[in-house]
């Protein structure tokens, strides 16, 4: 039966805990899968979505896979954690574009092991590595349009973690989508420098609220909790990323379907089936609602029609968006 080996930030503990899995027998037809979840599995965001996909594929594939997972790892410790996984698994997956640089380095050292990055881009890849692009910027354009449709103040905000091209491009397209609906809308964009910093995310959201923002979007992991705290205190609302909060949390008026879990399942299923291929693979809106889309809680038929039309225009090339 598949099982998780979850390890924390201390690299010594990571290595020690990993060693506990070494004696577990693995059937010849069982795929050993190592997964690096740099954040928390319960962040209500990217990491949780990836974890949900991992648990789903465990249920569907059963004894065909054995999973070893490392979570809550800092950037400085990422390469060593991935090396630990590569030493004992046939497929190693990094959840999040922040794992791509370290994953590339480790993949070069283990040419017989398959590697996949969920949220990868067109950066350097190696012959034994695949990069699955969720196309966040593409989806953010649609989310921005939705935010503009529901904003009562004409001011919306976006908070990103690391100020890197995919996250910056996502913020840019969020603003472009909003302005396609309301050219006069004000879009406030901030980067905290850390996907998991709750205090900085709260501070950035409160600053946006002080300028009139009533709808917030994000690319955050645990940092989302800070945005939630600010929105709850000030009575504003969030369009979430990755996980469905409609009907369970009044702060949320919608969520974007970024498909992190779907891509995690895809990587493992392809490897088990023997159809896994290296290289860059874009997903996004073209791959359907499991991979990318938007769900607005209680949206009217008219709003759904407008958002579907915007998505179609992106797919048809009538609306050009940035990479990311």
Question: Which role fits each region the language model picked out?
Answer:
Residues 6-7, 24, 92:
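Intrinsically disordered, low-complexity sequence elements enriched in Ser/Thr/Gly/Pro
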Residues 1-2, 27:
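Initiator methionine at the very start of the polypeptide chain
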Residues 2-14:
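Bacterial N-terminal signal peptides that target proteins for export
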Residues 27-324:
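A residue-level marker of the well-folded mature domains of exported/periplasmic proteins
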Residues 19-26:
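C-terminal segment of classical bacterial N-terminal signal peptides
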Residues 11-12, 18, 44:
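Sequence-pattern detector for short linear motifs
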Residues 8-11, 21, 62:
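Low-complexity, intrinsically disordered short peptide segments enriched in small/polar/basic residues
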């Amino acid at each position: 039966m598949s099982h998780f080996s979850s390890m924390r930030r201390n690299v010594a503990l990571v290595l020690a805990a990993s060693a506990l899995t070494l004696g577990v027998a693995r059937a010849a037809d069982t795929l050993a899968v190592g997964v690096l979840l740099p954040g928390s599995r319960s962040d209500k965001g990217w990491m949780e979505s990836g974890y949900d996909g991992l648990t789903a594929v465990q249920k569907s594939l059963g004894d065909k896979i054995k999973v070893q997972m490392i979570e809550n790892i800092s950037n400085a410790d990422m390469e060593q954690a991935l090396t630990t996984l590569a030493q004992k698994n046939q497929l190693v997956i990094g959840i999040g574009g922040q794992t791509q640089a370290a994953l590339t380095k480790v993949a070069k050292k283990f040419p017989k092991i398959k590697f996949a990055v969920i949220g990868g881009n067109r950066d350097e890849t190696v012959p034994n590595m695949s990069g699955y692009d969720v196309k966040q910027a593409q989806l953010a354009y649609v989310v921005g349009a939705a935010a503009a449709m529901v904003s009562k103040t004409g001011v919306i905000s976006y908070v990103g973690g690391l100020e890197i091209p995919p996250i910056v491009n996502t913020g840019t397209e969020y603003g472009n989508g909003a302005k396609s609906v309301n050219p006069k809308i004000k879009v406030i964009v901030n980067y905290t420098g850390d996907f998991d910093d709750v205090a900085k995310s709260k501070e950035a959201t409160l600053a946006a609220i002080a300028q009139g923002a009533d709808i917030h979007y994000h690319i955050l992991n645990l940092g989302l909790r800070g945005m939630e705290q600010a929105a709850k205190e000030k009575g504003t609302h969030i369009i979430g990323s990755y996980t469905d909060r409609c009907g369970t949390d009044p702060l949320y008026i919608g969520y974007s379907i970024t498909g992190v879990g779907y891509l995690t399942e895809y990587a493992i299923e392809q490897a088990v089936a023997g159809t896994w291929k290296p290289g860059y693979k874009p997903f996004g809106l073209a791959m359907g609602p499991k991979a990318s889309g938007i769900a607005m809680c209680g949206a009217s038929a008219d709003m759904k029609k407008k958002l579907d039309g915007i998505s179609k225009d992106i797919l048809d090339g009538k609306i050009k968006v940035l990479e990311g």
